[in-house]
């Protein structure tokens, strides 16, 4: 074993009581807290962003194909387009596409004897994969469709049910606004109640049969409001949207492709802001860990100043003496990183298992904090903390170079 490593290990694992021993423990605790907070911050931010994003995508898909209306609001009714089997088949053949479904929306008013509530009815057909919405269903079942007529069933949000004092299997009168401005009443049975936790959705949407909307609008069976497309990786949304628009042969010039990020920018801009908070907190934790380690190293050098003088008097080079304290500090850092990683992952596991951290769903779109551990991020936190600490600790270690052996040996 090299001299520097031997002495560093003897100092590090020396059980003799001293002031530096207290400082070492304090530095380890600070490193543990810093590493744990960084891991927890990353895991909670990842979980939060993914959970909210997946809720948005599950309700609306990742990409919409509809009539080209650049200034159209995300909750406005669509202009009709005609189904095009050639285009939809070309989209389905894309390896990145999971499914494609027709839809249309129409404003309506739900009314009971005491209350009324405006909704935007989202019409779907029997080809729709209910698995996308299954996670949101709190009560009831999916719509049952008929081959000959439209379904007289509706799914409403728990918010709407609460406002109108409705429950599962109740009949509700619904008024649709026809193209000529007149109201057309109908009576539908509530077969399901959903809750996404996203206020914009829960206060706005009800789900019904696409055929009903076609009939109300006077559309033909092959006329729809658009298509919603689900893809494998939401990170590729924009690229896939552009690919569909520009590269599919005979793509209608009156059609447009828009990502859900384009339609709901406020939600995704808010999610992006979490990255700033995450980065600031991680940066602060790194600074805290480094300051504690620098303080610890300076105290270690000052406490062992006579040892430094003796080693230099015996002919030890400055770099050899520096390495003793650098390796000692590295041992302290490694202990802190290992314990901090275990502590941070433990908190994440506990949250996944028990959900002990609760959130206000109206504000955060979820009732408890979501966690997603990305292991390469954990590895980056550990290796980055170790590397940055080592490089920064090089600076105070240069104190050793200024020590004069004669004065250091006389130091008490």
At which residue positions do the language-model features occur?
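Peri-membrane helix termini and adjoining interfacial loops of integral membrane proteins
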Residues: 1-9, 130-131, 258-260, 350-364
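Peri-transmembrane interface segments
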Residues: 14-25, 233-291, 300-302
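Hydrophobic alpha-helical transmembrane segments of multi-pass inner-membrane transport and secretion
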Residues: 20-46, 272-307, 330-339, 387-391
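Membrane-interface junction motifs in transport/secretion proteins
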Residues: 49-83
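A structural signal for hydrophobic secondary-structure junctions
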Residues: 80-221
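Transmembrane alpha-helical interface segments in multi-pass membrane proteins
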Residues: 298, 305-351
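Short helix-loop junctions at transmembrane helix boundaries
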Residues: 338-381, 394-398, 402
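Short cytosolic juxtamembrane segments of multi-pass membrane proteins
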Residues: 398-412
């Amino acid at each position: 074993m090299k001299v520097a490593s031997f002495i560093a290990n003897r100092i590090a694992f020396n059980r003799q009581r001293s002031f530096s021993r207290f400082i070492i423990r304090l530095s380890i605790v600070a490193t543990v807290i810093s590493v744990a907070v960084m891991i927890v911050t990353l895991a909670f931010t990842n979980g939060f962003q993914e959970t909210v994003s997946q809720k948005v995508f599950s309700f609306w898909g990742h990409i919409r194909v509809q009539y080209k209306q650049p200034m159209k609001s995300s909750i406005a009714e669509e202009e009709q387009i005609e189904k095009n089997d050639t285009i939809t088949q070309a989209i389905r053949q894309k390896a990145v596409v999971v499914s494609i479904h027709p839809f249309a929306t129409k404003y309506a008013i739900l009314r009971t004897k005491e209350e009324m509530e405006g909704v935007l009815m989202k019409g779907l057909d029997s080809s729709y994969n209910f698995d996308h919405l299954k996670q949101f269903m709190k009560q009831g079942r999916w719509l049952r469709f008929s081959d000959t007529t439209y379904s007289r069933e509706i799914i409403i949000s728990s918010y709407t049910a609460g406002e109108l004092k409705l429950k599962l299997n109740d009949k509700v009168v619904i008024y649709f606004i026809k193209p000529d401005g007149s109201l057309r009443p109908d009576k539908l049975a509530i077969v399901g109640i959903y809750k996404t936790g996203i206020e914009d959705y829960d206060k706005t949407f009800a789900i019904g049969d696409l055929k009903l909307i076609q009939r109300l609008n006077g559309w033909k069976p092959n006329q729809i409001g658009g298509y919603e497309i689900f893809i494998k990786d939401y990170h590729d949304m924009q690229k896939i949207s552009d690919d569909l628009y520009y590269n599919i042969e005979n793509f209608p010039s009156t059609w447009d492709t828009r990502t859900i990020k384009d339609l709901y920018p406020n939600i995704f801009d808010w999610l992006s802001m979490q990255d700033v908070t995450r980065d600031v907190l991680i940066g602060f934790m790194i600074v805290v860990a480094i300051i504690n380690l620098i303080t610890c190293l300076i105290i270690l050098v000052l406490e062992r100043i006579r040892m430094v003088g003796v080693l230099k008097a015996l002919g030890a080079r400055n770099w050899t003496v520096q390495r003793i304290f650098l390796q000692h500090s590295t041992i302290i850092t490694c202990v802190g990183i290992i314990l901090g990683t275990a502590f941070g992952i433990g908190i994440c596991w506990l949250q996944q298992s028990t959900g002990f951290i609760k959130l206000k769903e109206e504000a955060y779109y979820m009732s408890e904090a979501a966690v997603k551990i990305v292991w390469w991020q954990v590895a980056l936190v550990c290796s980055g903390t170790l590397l940055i600490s080592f490089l920064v600790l090089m600076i105070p270690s240069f104190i050793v170079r200024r020590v004069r052996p004669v004065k250091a040996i006389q130091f008490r």
